[in-house]
Amino acid sequence: MSHKDHYYNKSKQEGYRSRAAYKLKQLDREENLLHEGKSVVDLGAAPGGWLQVASEEVGETGTVVGVDLQRIKDVDGVETVRGDMTDEATKEKVRAIAGDAVDVVVSDMAPNMTGEYSVDHARSVHLARQAFETALDVLDTGGDFAVKVFEGQDVDDLREEIEDEFQYVRTLRPDASRDSSSEIYLVAKGRMTAPVAEGDVIEVEIVDEGSEGDGVAKVETYTLFVPDASEGETVEVEVTEVKPRFGFAERTDE
């Protein structure tokens, strides 16, 4: 039996809508994505194999939402939203079901194939980036994200963008992927968010000196770099730039 036939037949025997269900199972085994009680959003969820797996893993206390332009046949324990994942109206429907802060966002989307590899790769990266941007709008701090993309020259840039927002990112190729497939999965763990926003005016204590001579302040565990400030000072600052891991601020008390 071929590799393809094994997972196809296995999915039929075990009641999954697609062989892709086993890809999510492996991603979950390796990166611990799905837990009892978690909220999960699947982008591009039709026909629903990943929804079935997610529903099994989060159980009755969890929430699973599938989003797709196509109608998704009912899956036990799953709510579905028909719409474009990039539309704010669609995101609002997701939030109404899953809450404002989702634990996990996954996407197994693939573009309509042209047979021209460079085109298919570019379209795949575009879809993955749209899924990533949607995930940033709905994920909770500490949340996880997994997305399919075709290997190629643009993957590294996409991965770097994702790495900027999460504690770490792994590249995985599940056993259930076809031997001829170029698909890989980027699995990002631990969404990072800043406790401050641009324009905030706050009082901070300078606790260290950075390599460039700037003062270093901490807001919770978040680092702010403050020029013209010395260790031991308590100063009022305005936040001027915010990144996931650190930010910059200017003194307002001089």
Feature annotation, model-predicted:
Residues 1-254:
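SAM-dependent transferase fold signal centered on methyltransferase-like domains
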